[in-house]
Amino acid sequence: MEGVGAVRFWLVVCGCLAFPPRAESVCPERCDCQHPQHLLCTNRGLRAVPKTSSLPSPQDVLTYSLGGNFITNITAFDFHRLGQLRRLDLQYNQIRSLHPKTFEKLSRLEELYLGNNLLQALAPGTLAPLRKLRILYANGNEIGRLSRGSFEGLESLVKLRLDGNVLGALPDAVFAPLGNLLYLHLEANRIRFLGKNAFTQLGKLRFLNLSANELQPSLRHAATFVPLRSLSTLILSANSLQHLGPRVFQHLPRLGLLSLSGNQLTHLAPEAFWGLEALRELRLEGNRLNQLPLTLLEPLHSLEALDLSGNELSALHPATFGHQGRLRELSLRDNALSALSGDIFAASPALYRLDLDGNGWTCDCRLRGLKRWMGNWHSQGRLLTVFVQCRHPPALRGKYLDYLDDQLLQNGSCVDPSPSPTAGSRQWPISTAPGEGMTPPAGLAQELPLQPQPQPQQRGRLLPGVAWAGAAKELVGNRSALRLNRRGPGLQHQSPSAAAASGSAPQSLDLHEKPERGRPTRANLPQTEPTPTSEPASGTPSARDSWQRAAKQRLASEQQGRAVQYDSGVGLPPLVSDPCDFNKFILCNLTVEAVSANSASVRWAVREHRSPRPQGGARFRLLFDRFGQQPKFQRFVYLPERSDSATLHELRGDTPYLVCVEGVLGGRVCPVAPRDHCAGLVTLPEAGGRGGVDYQLLTLVLLAINALLVLLALAAWGSRWLRRKLRARRKGGAPVHVRHMYSTRRPLRSMGTGVSADFSGFQSHRPRTTVCALSEADLIEFPCDRFMDSSGGGTGGSLRREDHLLQRFAD
């Protein structure tokens, strides 16, 4: 045995010598070398670059991370053995200097990160060996000067970060070696002056960030940006710019984003943005602009986003955005605007995001055009919610323009500056012959002012081909709406022969309709405002005076009766012009009347009300869709005026539907969903056709099948458990008579009786058989067959036991 053990020992020794263990790589202290190509030493508290001499193959390392340590100096031999290195990270250290030969062996390096250190300069020639370098981060240092030799040899550089330094100027041709540079970050420095040749040889540059510097107040020299023909993003925000000269960006034909935010601009030359035909986004927020030249934005045909927030704009010309057909986003928030023309955004059909919040809006008749435009754009789903919160007058302070009625915007002292064409308001020249003395009556001097001498209150507009016949009967309260019959061209106060005889040149007369919506009171009813009739004037002052007196008397008597009626509020239904108020107070009782397999009829009620004349009567929009469908209400239909019922066709049988109705006033709908006017219905099953799937029956069948499967599984598990229980009892349990024999619950007497009865034939002089071998300590000899399994059962087993007993106890 000892010889065999010795042989085994020598065999093991020989095997170990023949197959030595594989040598493991030795990683530098405090570093991680789990991946053979990545050497990770980030945030390890290192104060010097670890030695890589212990690495078995340093040439395999491609990434070396040393960021977040306390390294202060880089020697010439720290990376001497890492010739295949592609990425070197030295950020967030305390490096103050770089040895001129630090990167001499790193000719394959592509990414170098030196950001957030204490470097004060990039010595000429230090980076020259890095011919394949594409990304260089030198941000967050203390670099105060640059020279052309700082970037010598970096022909492949694509991205350069120099932000967060203390650069005061850019020397001429400092970036000339970087012919392939695409991204240049110079923000957060102290640059005050841009040299004429600062960006020479940067013809491929796409991104230039000069924000947060100290540029001179005036940017006037266009030659600075001449080399940047491919520039698409220019950021000049957070400087001290105050003026922009004309055509300063004319050499940037591909510029798509220009940011001038956060400066102190107070003046922009009308041609400041000339040549920027490709500009898509212009940011001018946070300046001190109080006006915009009319032709400032004219060259920007491709403009899509314009931010003018945070300035001091108090007014905008209606044609300011007349050339921005692609404008999609416009911000005018936090300015000093009090009114805007309704036509100012008419040339921008793509506008969908408009921010007008934070201005001092004066909600009067000057905002009616803007309100109509907003309503039309909202109803067409082409504009997001615009918040125009009133600041003046005090009675409307804090309210939003789109929820105000036109009656609240009426001001007796304001003139509608430029009616919006979207509302159908056009100015029509009306010819008259002043030679015949046919001027408007004295009582209507305020209602019908001549165009050369506009009066403060212009209160009516006449359509072409309108005669004055019957106008006095249609003048209603202070609304001053002249319902005139269209009979001929112009105001026919005289016969054609008289007009021909006069021979005087006609004058143009502009009338502006200023309807006041709401219930008039006695205070605002005009008391002395005559109405012209169809009777021809005689042309003499006496005839004209008598005509005026008669008209005044008739009008005064009619208005006195109307004033009593208006004050008592009898017989005048409410005037509703807002679709939300119409849905809330006028529309009611939406019910489903008849339902079939493919159609359904709904009916609703409309309370008595009045609608503004320019808007016409109320129309209705019926929305319906299957219940639970997402998105909701993909189908809807517009109904004509005075409709109170509708029938939906082409519905699906045995399907639940949700039907809603809402009012449409002046082409506008309420932006709030009509939840109060909705009803549900379930169409009937299709008769005579192949019925669809009965989902209720299908559900019950599936539930029954699932319950049956559960019961079968429980039954199988129960039977298996019971079978295991019985099998365990058979294997581990003793015969029943043995358990009863040794039971402690049986009395001692009965147990002794049983023993004496069973072994009554015992004879001590007989020899023990080999069948039951007992030890010398046994006091009683038990028959072994009593411990045998009695499960053999049957008559044969009992007979064999009895025969054995007879043979043993024969004597």
UniProtKB/Swiss-Prot annotation:
GO terms for biological process: inflammatory response; innate immune response; regulation of cytokine production involved in immune response; toll-like receptor 4 signaling pathway. InterPro entries: Dev_Immune_Receptor, FN3_dom, FN3_sf, Leu-rich_rpt, Leu-rich_rpt_typical-subtyp, LRR_dom_sf. Residues 26-696 are extracellular. Residues 1-25 form the signal peptide. Residues 718-809 are cytoplasmic. Residues 421-430, 524-545 have a biased composition (Polar residues). Keywords: Glycoprotein, Immunity, Inflammatory response, Innate immunity, Leucine-rich repeat, Membrane, Phosphoprotein, Repeat, Signal, Transmembrane, Transmembrane helix. Residues 440-460, 494-508 have a biased composition (Low complexity). CDD domains: FN3. GO terms for molecular function: lipopolysaccharide binding. SMART domains: LRR_TYP (SM00369). The chain crosses the membrane at residues 697-717. Its main location: membrane. The modification Phosphoserine is found at residue 798. Disulfide bonds: none annotated. It is found in: Membrane. LRR repeats lie at residues 61-81, 84-105, 108-129, 132-153, 156-177, 180-201, 204-223, 230-251, 254-275, 278-298, 302-323, 326-347. Residues 414-460, 486-562 are annotated as: Disordered. Residues 26-57 form the LRRNT domain. The keyword NAD does not apply. Glycans are attached at residues 73, 411, 589. N-glycolysaled. Residues 510-519 have a biased composition (Basic and acidic residues). Belongs to the lipopolysaccharide (LPS) receptor, a multi-protein complex containing at least CD14, MD-2 and TLR4. Interacts with TLR4; this interaction is greatly enhanced following LPS stimulation. Interacts with LPS. Component of the TLR4 signaling complex. Mediates the innate immune response to bacterial lipopolysaccharide (LPS) leading to cytokine secretion and the inflammatory response. This is TLR4 interactor with leucine rich repeats.
